[in-house]
A protein has these predicted regions:
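Generic structural signal for short, solvent-exposed loop/turn connectors between secondary structure elements
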Residues: 76, 114-115, 130-131
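Charged, flexible boundary elements
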Residues: 25-50
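Short hydrophobic beta-strand segments
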Residues: 1-2, 61
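Glycine-rich phosphate-binding loop and adjoining helix at the ATP-binding site
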Residues: 3-34, 84-103, 118, 125-149
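Short, small-residue-rich loop/turn micro-motifs
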Residues: 75, 123-125
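Gly/Thr-rich phosphate-binding beta-strand-loop-beta motif of the actin/hexokinase/Hsp70
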Residues: 46-81
Length: 149
């Protein structure tokens, strides 16, 4: 319906009522977000993939939170190391702080295993092809620095 289209087009734009969402999606897709009216709906491309359940080998689990970070080392399903460290990513503008905190956690966990077969990461945000498109943890890192990494 063209009335709904015009409404959505008006609110999801720069200076529109939903400018935050427009800007967010523009960052995710790396181009200005736009509302498009079409008569043709593309065919769905769903391809379900079973994930998880792998307990064999040497694995690291990492959770990047807003006030702490957690990391665990697991060998053949048994936890061999686990730590929780207070950190402040949401209020820190220096990208080295983030990088060093994450690398330190991963290296510490890895030091408790003979090798690393897999790393699983949990963090709020949108990640595409191992690239951080948007993440609340890096709110204070300027875009000029953020997109260098």
């Amino acid at each position: 319906d063209s009335e709904i289209y015009e409404y959505l087009k008006d609110v999801y734009r720069a200076e529109g009522a939903r400018e935050f969402d427009w800007d967010f999606m523009s960052d995710v897709f790396e181009k200005p977000f736009e509302v498009v009216l079409t008569d043709e709906i593309p065919e769905t491309l769903d391809k379900p993939v079973s994930m998880g359940g792998h307990l064999d080998g040497c694995r690291i689990g990492f959770d990047a939170g807003g006030s702490d970070r957690k990391v665990s080392a697991v060998v053949d399903g048994e936890t061999v190391y686990s730590e929780e460290v207070v950190w402040f990513p949401k209020i820190t503008a220096d990208p080295d702080y983030h990088y060093e905190g994450i690398v330190s956690a991963l290296k510490t966990a890895a030091s408790h295993m003979p090798r690393v077969d897999a790393i699983g990461v949990s963090s709020a945000g949108v990640y595409v092809d191992n690239r951080i498109m948007v993440a609340s943890l890096f709110l204070k890192v300027s875009n000029d620095l953020f997109f260098l990494f």
